[in-house]
Amino acid sequence: MAHMIVAGNWKMNASKSAVTELLSGLKDNVASVSNAELVVFPPFPYLAQAQAELMGTGIRIGVQNICAQDKGAYTGEVSLVMAKEFDVSYVLVGHSERRALFAEDDSQEAAKYVATQAMLLTPILCVGETLEQREQGRTLSVVNGQIQAVIDAAGGASFAHAVIAYEPVWAIGTGLTASPMQAQEVHRAIRDHIADVAPEQARGLKILYGGSVTAASAEELFAQADIDGGLVGGASLQALSLIHI
């Protein structure tokens, strides 16, 4: 199995004590993970705690969202400059919950992607379709449109320093998951779309699956040719679940 990325998005969950317990479990078991890079995405208030507790472990830290602006009158926002002080490596860009709940559009996500790379951090660009869009046969047009917005803003070569996560919206937090064949079809299409403008970058690009990944579903999903790991939600709140994935 090729080197993979397994990223745990905690969303708006956990507490100080829960973070300590979760990170302790990951640290105790990370030595058993030889074929994947582990990344955790805590809520902002726990970044300093994660930084301190994960130092020297090889487990990476990411943030769930950022503001594309460096500083200013943006009440409630957190800049990349601030996030970088906590040894952050990755930034989620365009998660479906940001798009759906906060009405963020492709142009905003492209701006965050560009800003993330300007700070020498790695964006994980999240793309995916709703159930309605899938039933209308629009999956690939929606996903490729979300990617094209980034290509237009940053160029295809930018994917040398990025990761993509395909997250079918209908499979997030629902217990549903795309079949390995369905996921592979979209992952292959994503790679092909980027290859049209940046073939070398497309070949080396990590494309994660992010639709209710569990230990039970991970093995078959990760065996697919174009699936390079997972963006894990609920299962990442239990250390052993993430390790087993």
Task: Explain the meaning of each model-derived region.
Residues V6-G8, L38-P42, I61-Q64, V91-V93, ...:
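Hydrophobic faces of well-ordered beta-strands that scaffold small-molecule active sites
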Residues P45-A52, T75, A100-A111, S179-Q184, ...:
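Active-site-adjacent beta->alpha loops and helix N-cap segments on the catalytic face
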Residues R60-A110:
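Glycine/small-residue-rich loop that forms an oxyanion/phosphate-binding "nest" at active or ligand-binding sites
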Residues M1-Q69, A73-V78:
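Conserved N-terminal beta1-alpha1 strand-loop-helix module at the mouth
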Residues V213-A225:
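Catalytic cores of alpha/beta
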Residues K11, P43, A83, H95, ...:
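Conserved, mostly hydrophobic/aromatic
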Residues P123-E200:
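Active-site rim beta-loop-alpha module in soluble metabolic enzymes
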Residues I243-I245:
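Conserved small/polar residues in nucleotide/adenosyl-binding loops
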